[in-house]
Amino acid sequence: MSLRLGQIVDALGGSLEGGERDTEILRIAPLESSGPGDLSFLSNPRYQSQLAASQAACVIVAPAMRNAALERGACIVVEQPYTYFAHVTQLWVRAHGQGAPAGIHPSAVVDPQARVAPTASIGPLCVVERGAVIGAHTVLKSRVTVGERCTVGERCILHPGVVIGADGFGFAQQRGEWIKIEQLGAVRIGNDVEIGANTCIDRGALDDTVIEDGVKLDNLIQIAHNVHIGRHTAMAGCSAVAGSTRIGAHCTIAGAASIVGHLQLADNVHISTNTVVTHSITQPGQYTGVFPMDDNAKWEKNAATLRQLYRLRERIKALEQTRKDG
């Protein structure tokens, strides 16, 4: 498998400098381990030291790195090297026929009342239930389940073991017993969504659970019933969102972060790893917080004190200054 530098530049743009269009690229590789015949990229100037030592046939660089790249050989100069690299990987897959073939695998179970676009790919052991809709060019890899009446848009990728539309966790308590609340909603997934392996998105209790266009979900994520995730939000592995929470557009949720139910997060909110979000966030920005488990009454007192810590610090500093002045 190979591509020539001229083919890459013709397809994606960029300025090829210090090299020949017919140079053959055999592999896309990291800068530090690349060799002859490889195409690599430098997106962070901190790793410029690796550039001089790289054996890559060609390196994708920003204009600021052009001269340094030319000292070692060929380069493709673009404004956003990392984004260009992403497009190169897609071009590579298309050129070498590595994408999933359209059609339904013989071992998949698709209800006659489901609608699957002719260009969609339904992998081995998938289940698509009654009334479900799978959009054009969407790929369901092995063992994906799309539940009754759930909708998956166009150009989506669902990795192995994804479950769309299992019942949400809804129960009413009666005399010490749990009475199941039937989950009557569905799940609606927009276009260009990617969902990692073994992630679960539960159907809504009454209204639908909604995942908007361009959302990216990592492996092992739990999305509870009636959650609404805004467009182009990304969530890393082992994070979780409890029921009826609304997350805005262009947010990022780092690994193992948890968001409790019935909250609202504004657009462009960024949650750090292991953070537990317990109240709504109305302003864009980065939010971080980790607090140890304790008896609940003690935890509430300590948490309340912690929130006043900076104010207490300033009061102490003022008192100390008063003593010095006195």
Swiss-Prot record:
Pfam families: Hexapep (PF00132), LpxD (PF04613)
Catalytic activity: a UDP-3-O-[(3R)-3-hydroxyacyl]-alpha-D-glucosamine + a (3R)-hydroxyacyl-[ACP] = a UDP-2-N,3-O-bis[(3R)-3-hydroxyacyl]-alpha-D-glucosamine + holo-[ACP] + H(+)
Any GO MF annotation of the entry: N-acyltransferase activity
Residues at the active site: H225 (proton acceptor)
Gene Ontology terms describing biological process: lipid A biosynthetic process
Pathway: Bacterial outer membrane biogenesis; LPS lipid A biosynthesis
Keywords, comma-separated and alphabetical: Acyltransferase, Lipid A biosynthesis, Lipid biosynthesis, Lipid metabolism, Repeat, Transferase
Enzyme Commission identifier(s): 2.3.1.191
Highest taxon, organism lineage: Bacteria
Keyword field contains Coiled coil: no
Top EC class of this enzyme: transferase
GO cellular component: membrane
Protein family according to the UniProt entry: Belongs to the transferase hexapeptide repeat family. LpxD subfamily.
Quaternary structure and partners: Homotrimer.
Function statement: Catalyzes the N-acylation of UDP-3-O-acylglucosamine using 3-hydroxyacyl-ACP as the acyl donor. Is involved in the biosynthesis of lipid A, a phosphorylated glycolipid that anchors the lipopolysaccharide to the outer membrane of the cell.
Name used for this protein in its record: UDP-3-O-acylglucosamine N-acyltransferase
Organism: Acidovorax ebreus (strain TPSY)
